């Protein structure tokens, strides 16, 4: 969602703030702004649209103060206009905010009754005036923030600077991430470590309810009660040099092509390739034999990774699996069994709905395991055990390499649990590990052979609607393929289990409808072929993603075939993810869309 940066140091802060905000562009945004303190006085510059618009504004109207805050906004309350852009200010302070203040209308009405004037449509402006009201009552900045925070309902991260206080930067967190960076004679606030990587790798994270008072040389952490607390200082693994497209046109293209490397790196972290066994890089805090059920919750693409994993856990570990989207599960008050394990999947480790599910599971006596790409994230810290993906920072809003790395980790977990529970013997484990070892090479073969995909994309770009079909682990890929196409090309697409075709979707089939069938050579290929023939019989345009064997079995005229190498079906889902990503990518590029920052989308959804 929104990105927050704060800097207190000795040199001009605005340029550094903009540099840090560029590293948060991947979160998605529609406006940006900076506020600094120069000679003790607040000044703001804001702009609608991309950061380059803010840079142009700053070039004409520079800010030179050594203390400042910056923000990239993703609209939740109020349209994406300059007037609604952060920082918001009163006569005493400026504030930036990530999250949602749920009771802002109630607070706004109260503050209006006390003479406060509001000039924006946002919930954030209420925070500025609420703290200002406390200061008008005689409190200093820190005490005013302390008094205001308990009155705010919702999830938020905040950063404040105060008129007349040139050595003071205050941050607060409730439900949305916020990190403190430690420098030499300067201190930093940021939504994540990636934003602060050019300046420091020495990081501490606020916990829920925390607020922190920063000066150039010190960080004073306080909990919700105002008591002094310590938070561990960690060495961030984020690099100042990671945000780079290399020789690719878009981050998404780069990240698709990085998959052979990062999937290989992730698998190497979990597999003993010489012995043909899974070696988890952590101790499981439970007895696998005592598990009674697995519950998986996640959002978006991570949910589809969990849906693939359901097949693996049931097949290899012989465990029943329930999976639900986190935004639904968290409100269901679902009964959870004794001996249950909750697995949550999140690229950022900060997804609000997924975090709520994790906390619900812990409150109800479940063991918890998190598959995350950010090992220092809130979800990683709060779970019983974190299973890291080694995808590296993913900048494109549409997830690609994080998805295949999530699948890789979940596959290893399924094998490990199956072996520990006696559902797999050593020979079968070695066979499955051998299949996983082959995955990076198969991915490399797919991502370097894009001619057929690029040609098909030019045709697909003219479609109004697209249908994706699959069975088994290819069914979640059909859902993911439809999501990818919707996300970045804005073409309406739907994914279905191929066996459900006759239960409704077949009514949509005509000569205008492209039907993309994901069909590895697996035990249900014959059934999938019958579905393709049903589509062809009704004039539908069948596009097959599979190997040559499936083409031969289909025995129909295909509009297009995206060729895949022959492989074992067990983990074909990891490899078959690449062509659906590439097809969405090239279609969107052909249409001239903003692939890395599609409209209305955010990378890390830290609000409900």
Predicted regions and their residues:
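Active-site phosphate/pyrophosphate-binding segments
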Residues: 259-263, 267-295, 364, 385-514, ...
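Conserved short alpha-helical segments that host acidic/polar catalytic motifs at enzyme active sites
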Residues: 1-245, 249-250, 258-292, 304, ...
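Glycine-rich oxoanion-binding loops at beta->alpha junctions
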Residues: 49, 66-83, 274-286, 309-345, ...
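Glycine-rich phosphate-binding loops that contact phosphosugars or nucleotide phosphates
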Residues: 289-431, 435-438, 518-560, 583, ...
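Buried hydrophobic positions in well-ordered alpha/beta secondary-structure cores of metabolic enzymes
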Residues: 2, 28, 69, 99, ...
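Generic beta-strand/beta-sheet core signal
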Residues: 96, 161, 172, 181-183, ...
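Extended hydrophobic-aromatic, low-complexity segments
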Residues: 181, 305-307, 322-323, 352-355, ...
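Generic C-terminus detector
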Residues: 226, 252, 541, 567-608
């Amino acid at each position: 969602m929104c990105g927050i940066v704060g800097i207190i140091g000795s040199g001009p802060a605005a340029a550094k703030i903009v540099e840090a905000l560029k590293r948060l562009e991947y979160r998605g945004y529609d406006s940006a702004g900076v506020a600094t303190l120069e000679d003790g006085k607040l000044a703001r510059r804001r702009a609608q649209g991309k950061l380059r618009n803010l840079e142009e504004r700053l070039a004409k109207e520079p800010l030179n103060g050594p203390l400042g805050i910056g923000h990239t906004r993703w609209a939740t309350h109020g349209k994406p206009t300059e007037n609604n852009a952060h920082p918001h200010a009163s006569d005493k302070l400026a504030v930036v905010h990530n999250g949602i203040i749920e009771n802002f209308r109630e607070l706004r009405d109260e503050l209006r009754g006390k003479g406060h004037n509001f000039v924006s449509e946002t919930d954030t402006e209420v925070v500025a005036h609420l703290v200002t009201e406390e200061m008008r009552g005689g409190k200093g900045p820190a005490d005013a923030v302390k008094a205001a925070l308990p009155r705010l309902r919702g999830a938020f991260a905040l950063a404040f600077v105060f008129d007349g206080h040139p050595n003071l930067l205050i941050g607060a967190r409730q439900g949305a991430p916020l990190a403190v960076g430690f420098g030499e004679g300067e201190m930093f606030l940021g939504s994540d470590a990636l934003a602060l990587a050019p300046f420091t790798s020495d990081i501490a994270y606020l916990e829920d309810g925390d607020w922190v008072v920063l000066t150039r040389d010190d960080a004073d952490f306080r909990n919700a009660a105002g008591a002094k607390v310590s938070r561990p200082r960690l060495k961030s693994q984020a690099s100042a040099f990671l945000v780079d497209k290399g020789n690719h046109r878009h981050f998404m293209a780069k990240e698709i092509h990085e998959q052979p490397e990062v999937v290989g790196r992730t698998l190497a972290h979990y597999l003993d390739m010489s012995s043909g066994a899974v070696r988890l890089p952590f101790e499981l805090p439970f007895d696998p034999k005592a598990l009674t059920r697995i519950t998986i919750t996640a959002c978006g693409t991570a949910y589809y990774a969990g849906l693939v994993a359901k097949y693996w856990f049931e097949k290899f570990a012989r465990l029943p699996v329930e999976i639900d989207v986190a935004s639904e599960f968290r409100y269901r008050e679902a009964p959870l069994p004794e001996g249950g394990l909750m697995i949550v999947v999140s690229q950022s480790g900060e997804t609000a709905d997924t975090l709520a599910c994790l906390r619900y599971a812990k409150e109800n006596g479940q063991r918890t395991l998190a598959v995350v790409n950010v090992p220092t994230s809130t979800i990683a810290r709060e779970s019983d055990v974190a299973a890291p993906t080694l995808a590296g920072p993913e900048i494109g809003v549409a997830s690609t390499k994080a998805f295949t790395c999530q699948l890789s980790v979940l596959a290893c977990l399924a094998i490990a649990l199956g072996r520990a529970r006696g559902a797999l013997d050593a020979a079968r484990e070695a066979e499955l590990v051998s299949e996983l070892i082959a995955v990076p090479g198969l991915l490399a073969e797919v991502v370097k052979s894009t001619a057929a995909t690029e040609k098909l994309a030019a045709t697909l770009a003219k479609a109004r609607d697209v249908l994706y079909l699959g069975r088994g682990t290819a069914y979640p890929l059909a859902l993911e393929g439809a999501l990818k196409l919707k996300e970045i090309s804005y073409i309406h697409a739907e994914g279905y289990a191929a066996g459900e075709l006759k239960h409704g979707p077949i009514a949509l089939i005509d000569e205008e409808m492209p039907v993309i069938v994901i069909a590895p050579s697996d035990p249900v290929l014959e059934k999938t072929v019958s579905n393709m023939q049903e589509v062809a019989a009704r004039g539908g345009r069948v596009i097959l993603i599979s190997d040559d064997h499936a083409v031969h079995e289909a025995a129909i005229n295909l509009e297009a075939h995206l060729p895949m190498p022959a492989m074992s079906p067990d983990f074909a889902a990891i490899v078959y993810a690449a062509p659906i990503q590439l097809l969405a990518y090239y279609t969107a590029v052909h249409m001239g869309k903003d692939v890395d920052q599609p409209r209305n989308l955010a990378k890390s959804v830290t609000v409900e």
